[in-house]
């Protein structure tokens, strides 16, 4: 372009710039130029609000649409793709949980605990949650791995030992699969299961009989073969059939087969009630052994027995007491005896039982002094393989899944072998044996034995040999954990004082409320209830006397003496009852309660039973049992030096339910009287219906306001279920009287003195403070103490006034 052209172009641009609409536009640069902001106006604000509302409405509609699609279209039942996606999600979560468990063994242990039945998992989870709340992860993990995991492993071994092969075979029958979960069942479930077992035994009997009884010509041996087939089915359930020892086949049988026992045995094996008792006992024992396996029976949890076994024993005792109070004994003449009084007067009363044994031990002590014998106190314990739990509450690694019953059988077998060896060596002793539980329920024995002084070392060495011969390597040179012996020094205490503590703490804990057990840390009196529940559950004989005449003849003689005293009437006290003077001397000794004289008159200690002068007589019961057989009952006493027997149970008593109270019977009369035994109408309606009659005739209810604490306690415990319901209804209908505020009355001088003392202690001494103290309140005085006014004195203590 030439210079002239450029001048012409520049002139054109200058001419164009003279107009605004023709000026050149500026180039846009977003990095350098600021964006122009639109002016704010009312219209722009309104448009912005409408846009926001439309956006929120659009989001709400989209969310609602998604919910509708997910509910009706994209769910597992309608959309297979969605279902497959959900399944893949669950599988991935399960794989993730499995991987976490594989790398975290604690979660595996927790899952195993939660998979256990409730009677196992609930108490274990409570302990696990406690350790988890401590905030110590290492201790929590160590507790799971070192305590909970071994407990679960031991639990599986115990279950395998309980369910034998034959027992599992019986559970494979139709309807009997509940046998596999027998420890987890309740009483109602066990009752239903026992009915099914009885029905199965009935079918076995029908199959065994076949056409055997089509004719009357049936031999007793054929009936016995039928019984053997039913008994074999019973043995598969680990239950010994009735009369099994008498009826089973023996290679060298000396006596003829008692075929008359077969009907009663078959009747029991076909009875649902009999099976319920057997299965319930088995269930309780198996359940207790499972709780022992997981360390829930120990000094750290519940000593001697589990907590639920203790509660069951209390409930059983309560039901027995209600049964005794609702029944009475009636004879042919119409005389009645309250059944509760009869039970309390018998040896079932713990106080009578304790007194009788203490009198017997005292008699042995007097005889030993007369003979010049020495007394030795022994303690025998089972090997460590019988103990399930250590003293610290952790599982014992040497435990071999043995039961409490097996530990008792071990001691019985050991003692029988020792007595055989002792008699073979010509050694004799007499005394008493006490069976006690360790904190985990394992049995150990205490023996108080009397013997000749020259035989003491030999007998002690022989007993030590039998007590430690099993698992001898675990003891080493110290045999104290298994066997202890102590020669009783008369200067320190008598033999009776040694054994008195063990007798009392295993019966009712009389006189031991202040002593604490070193093993459990509880009072010996409180432990007595647990010990009795332990002995009842595992069927352990707590006390056993040996080398002396039987105590049942002693009881029958005392009963005979009481009957003779009532019949003699005006005769002189101490007059002979029996014609034979030797027998009458034994009767007099028993009546006086002197066991020493009774034993010596019977022939003395270490005398075989066949040489005792008086023995217990038995007879066959006239009335048959529910199974058709006739049992054996006590008749009285008899003696080989006198003819005939002496009956001490001449009067036949029959147990009947007590008669209904007349007032209760009248309450159920009228047009609304029920046609059944009980009245199912609401109690409030009954009370309203008879309220007018009672108000007109006078209130015949017992006035409990005039009773003391003991009478009120006895009255409330003697009430039946109906009386309890009526009392509860009366309490709901009658409005309780509000107790007026108690305010102490003081003189003006005492009030001024109280105000002065309050001001001296730094209080205001106002009328409000004085009125609060006079009404029984208290005022905080600092350091956790409170002041209160009692007996015209201002006192200060950290306890509330009502606790005094």
UniProtKB/Swiss-Prot annotation:
One of the GO biological process terms: DNA replication
Keyword Nucleotidyltransferase recorded: no
Record flagged with keyword Zinc-finger: no
GO MF, one annotated term: endonuclease activity
Free-text function comment from the UniProt entry: Possible endonuclease which induces a single-strand cut and initiates DNA replication.
EC number(s) from the headed UniProt entry: 3.1.-.-
Class in the EC hierarchy, top level: hydrolase
UniProt name for this protein: Probable replication endonuclease from prophage-like region 1
Family annotation (Pfam families): Phage_GPA (PF05840)
Lineage: Bacteria, Pseudomonadati, Pseudomonadota, Gammaproteobacteria, Enterobacterales
Family designation: Belongs to the phage GPA family.
Catalytic site positions: 498, 502
Keywords: DNA replication, Endonuclease, Hydrolase, Nuclease
């Amino acid at each position: 372009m030439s210079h002239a052209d450029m001048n012409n172009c520049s002139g054109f641009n200058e001419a164009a710039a003279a107009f605004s609409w023709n000026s050149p536009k500026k180039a846009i640069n977003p990095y350098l130029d600021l964006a122009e902001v639109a002016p704010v106006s009312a219209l722009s604000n309104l448009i912005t609000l409408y846009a926001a509302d439309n956006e929120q409405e659009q989001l709400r509609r989209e969310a609602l649409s998604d919910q509708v699609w997910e509910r009706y279209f994209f769910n597992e039942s309608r959309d297979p793709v969605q279902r497959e996606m959900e399944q893949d999600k669950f599988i991935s979560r399960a794989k993730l949980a499995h991987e976490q468990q594989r790398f975290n063994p604690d979660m595996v242990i927790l899952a195993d605990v939660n998979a256990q039945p409730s009677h196992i998992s609930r108490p274990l989870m409570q302990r696990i949650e406690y350790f988890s709340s401590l905030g110590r992860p290492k201790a929590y993990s160590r507790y799971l791995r070192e305590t909970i995991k071994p407990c679960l492993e031991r639990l599986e071994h115990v279950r395998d030992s309980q369910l034998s092969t034959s027992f599992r075979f019986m559970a494979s029958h139709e309807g009997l699969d509940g046998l596999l979960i027998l420890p987890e069942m309740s009483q109602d479930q066990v009752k239903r299961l026992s009915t099914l077992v009885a029905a199965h035994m009935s079918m076995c009997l029908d199959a065994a009989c076949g056409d055997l009884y089509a004719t009357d010509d049936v031999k007793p041996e054929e009936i016995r073969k039928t019984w053997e087939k039913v008994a074999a089915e019973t043995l598969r359930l680990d239950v010994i059939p009735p009369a099994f020892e008498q009826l089973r086949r023996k290679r060298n049988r000396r006596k003829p087969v008692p075929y008359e026992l077969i009907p009663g045995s078959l009747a029991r094996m076909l009875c649902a009630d009999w099976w319920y008792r057997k299965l319930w006992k088995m269930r309780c024992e198996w359940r207790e052994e499972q709780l022992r396996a997981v360390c829930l029976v120990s000094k750290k949890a519940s000593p001697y027995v589990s907590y639920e076994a203790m509660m069951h024993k209390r409930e059983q005792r309560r039901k027995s007491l209600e049964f005794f109070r609702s029944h009475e004994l009636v004879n042919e003449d119409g005389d009645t005896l309250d059944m509760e009084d009869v039970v309390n007067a018998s040896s079932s009363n713990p106080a009578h039982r304790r007194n009788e044994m203490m009198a017997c031990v005292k008699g042995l002590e007097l005889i030993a002094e007369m003979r010049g014998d020495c007394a030795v106190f022994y303690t025998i314990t089972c090997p460590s393989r019988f103990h399930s739990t250590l003293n610290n509450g952790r599982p014992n690694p040497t435990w071999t899944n043995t039961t409490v019953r097996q530990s008792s059988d071990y001691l019985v077998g050991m003692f029988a072998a020792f007595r055989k060896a002792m008699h073979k060596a010509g050694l004799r002793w007499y005394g008493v044996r006490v069976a006690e539980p360790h904190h985990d329920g394992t049995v150990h024995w205490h023996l108080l034995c009397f013997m000749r002084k020259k035989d003491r070392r030999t007998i002690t060495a022989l007993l030590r040999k039998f007590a430690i011969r099993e698992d001898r390597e675990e003891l080493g040179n110290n045999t104290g954990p298994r066997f202890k012996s102590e020669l009783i020094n008369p200067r320190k205490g008598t033999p009776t004082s040694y054994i008195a503590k063990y007798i009392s703490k295993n019966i009712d804990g009389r006189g031991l409320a202040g002593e604490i057990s070193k093993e459990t840390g509880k009072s010996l009196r409180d432990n007595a209830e647990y010990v009795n529940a332990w002995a009842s559950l595992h069927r352990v004989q707590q006390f056993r006397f040996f080398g002396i005449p039987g105590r049942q003849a002693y009881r029958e003689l005392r009963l005979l003496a009481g009957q003779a005293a009532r019949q003699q009437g005006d005769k002189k006290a101490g007059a002979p009852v029996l014609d034979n003077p030797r027998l009458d001397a034994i009767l007099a000794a028993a009546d006086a309660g002197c066991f020493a004289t009774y034993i010596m008159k019977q022939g003395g200690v270490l005398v075989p039973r066949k040489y005792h002068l008086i023995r217990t007589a038995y007879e066959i019961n006239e009335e048959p049992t529910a199974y058709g057989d006739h049992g054996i009952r006590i008749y009285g006493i008899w003696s080989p030096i006198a003819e005939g027997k002496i009956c001490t149970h001449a009067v036949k008593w029959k147990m009947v339910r007590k008669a209904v109270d007349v007032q209760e019977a009248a309450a159920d009369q009228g047009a609304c009287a029920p046609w059944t035994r009980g009245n199912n109408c609401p109690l409030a309606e009954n009370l309203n219906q008879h309220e007018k009659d009672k108000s007109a005739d006078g209130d015949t209810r017992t006035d409990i306001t005039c009773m003391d604490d003991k009478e009120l306690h006895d009255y409330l415990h003697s009430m039946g279920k109906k009386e309890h319901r009526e009392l509860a209804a009366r309490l709901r209908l009658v409005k309780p009287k509000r107790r007026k505020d108690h305010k102490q009355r003081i003189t003006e001088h005492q009030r001024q003195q109280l105000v002065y003392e309050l001001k001296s202690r730094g209080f205001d001494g106002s009328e409000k403070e004085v009125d609060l103290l006079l009404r029984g309140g208290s005022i905080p005085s600092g350091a956790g103490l409170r002041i209160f006014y009692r007996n015209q004195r201002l006192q200060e203590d950290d306890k509330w006034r009502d606790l005094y």
